[in-house]
Amino acid sequence: MVGPWRFHGHAIVSADDRIAGADGLTPQALRNEADWARFQAALDRAAVTVLGRFGHEANPNLKRRNRLVLSSTARGLERRADAWWWNPAETDLADALVHAAPDGGIVVVPGGRRVFDLFLGVGYDAFDLARAERVTIPDGVPIFSAVAPGITAADLLVRHGLVAEVTEVIDTAADISLARWVCRAVP
């Protein structure tokens, strides 16, 4: 949590913790209606959604939800017709959020990898990690840069202070599970 904002990550990954193929695109095997419905409900509750430029351009904002697009081409923080555009190398997160979501609230973080990495460092309050248990994506894009042989997304979430609160199967036929990770209470 930073100020009045709570950071909630959302992703669906393959069994080998990939969010995209080598081409950077989300493969059809990671598209699931049960996960999509939960994700859309989370977006409806969000004060702002923070995502990368590629994701913003690939996913039209048909519902005109409030977006903060992370891009190294933005000059600090810019209000453009389609969204807030933010370069974290020039403007810090709290300053960007004061403008993009001045009343605080939930900041939904759906990626891509650079955005997931940034908020892993900031600190997630919660992370909904759906997993397609029967899907692998050799040479795909891992959810976090530090995912490597012997280091899973779950390992990284634990290292950054989260614990798996509950895991449930959200689509039995497709073997999709969802783990809700939450920030550990500080004694």
Task: Tell me what each language-model feature is.
Residues 1-187:
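Enzymes that bind and transform nitrogen-containing heteroaromatic metabolites
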